A protein has these predicted regions:
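Membrane-proximal cytosolic interface modules of multi-pass membrane proteins
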Residues: 1-2
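Acidic donor-binding segment of Leloir-type glycosyltransferases
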Residues: 5-47, 52
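Short glycine-/polar-rich loops that comprise or flank the Walker A/P-loop
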Residues: 12-14, 98, 180
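Short acidic donor-binding/metal-coordinating loop in glycosyltransferase active sites
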Residues: 21, 69, 77-79, 168
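Long helical/loop segments within the catalytic core of UDP-sugar-dependent glycosyltransferases
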Residues: 32-71, 83-166, 177
Length: 180
C-alpha cells in the first residue's frame, strides 16, 4: 500500500482500491493505512467482501463494479512497484489497440535460499526469453497475475473476470486475445 501511494504519478489520477479478503489481523492494519492515506488526499478505498467466493478472480470481479478508472493496475500484496512504474507503463496505452501492459519484476529475496534462487531464475527466463520473444514477434503477452495494467474496456469486452478457474490471469489473457 505504501509503495502504491509512493508512485510518482498525479494523485488525482489514481483511484486506489485495496481488495482485502484476508481473515487475520491484517485487516485492521490495512484499514489504518487507508485512513492515513485518505487523510493525505488519496482517493483510496478498502474493499472487503462478505465471502471469499472466487478467490482473487472473485475479488477482482467484485471491484470492477466500483472502479471509475480507464486503466486497472493490479499488484498482489507482496509486490512492491517502483516509483516510476505508472509513468513508464501508461504511455503504451496511447495506442488504442493496446489492452494490456505486462511489466517485468525483480526479486527482493532472490538470495534467501536455493528455492528463491531457482524461482528467480525461472521468472527471469520467463521475462527475458519467453516474453521478449513474444514481444519482438508482436504476439500477445499473457497477464502474469500482478504488475500488469489492463485497459478496463478490454477486461469488459473480454467478459470480465471469471471465477470458475484458478488461473484467472491466463483465462482473461486468452479471452482478450481471442477478442482481438
Amino acid at each position: 500500500i505504501n509503495s502504491v501511494c509512493d508512485l510518482d504519478y498525479p494523485k488525482q489520477k489514481m483511484h486506489i482500491m485495496i481488495l482485502d479478503d484476508s481473515d487475520d489481523n491484517t485487516t485492521e492494519q490495512v484499514a489504518e493505512l487507508v485512513k492515513n492515506y485518505k487523510g493525505k488526499g488519496f482517493d483510496i478505498s478498502h474493499i472487503r467482501r462478505g465471502t471469499r467466493q472466487g478467490y482473487k478472480a472473485g475479488a477482482l470481479k467484485y471491484a470492477m463494479k466500483y472502479t471509475k478508472s480507464e486503466f486497472v493496475a493490479i499488484f498482489d500484496a507482496d509486490f512492491i512497484p517502483p516509483t516510476w512504474y505508472l509513468k513508464r507503463a501508461i504511455p503504451y496505452f496511447a495506442k488504442p489497440n493496446i489492452g494490456l501492459v505486462q511489466c517485468r519484476w525483480g526479486h527482493v529475496n532472490e538470495n534467501y535460499s536455493a528455492l528463491t534462487q531457482a524461482q528467480a531464475l525461472s521468472l527471469d527466463f520467463h521475462f527475458l526469453v519467453e516474453q521478449k520473444a513474444k514481444s519482438n514477434s508482436r504476439m500477445f503477452m499473457n497477464f502474469n497475475g500482478t504488475a500488469g495494467i489492463w485497459r478496463k474496456e478490454c477486461i469488459d469486452d473480454s467478459g470480465g473476470w471469471h471465477t470458475a478457474t484458478l488461473v484467472e490471469d491466463l483465462d482473461l489473457s486468452y479471452r482478450a486475445q481471442m477478442k482481438g
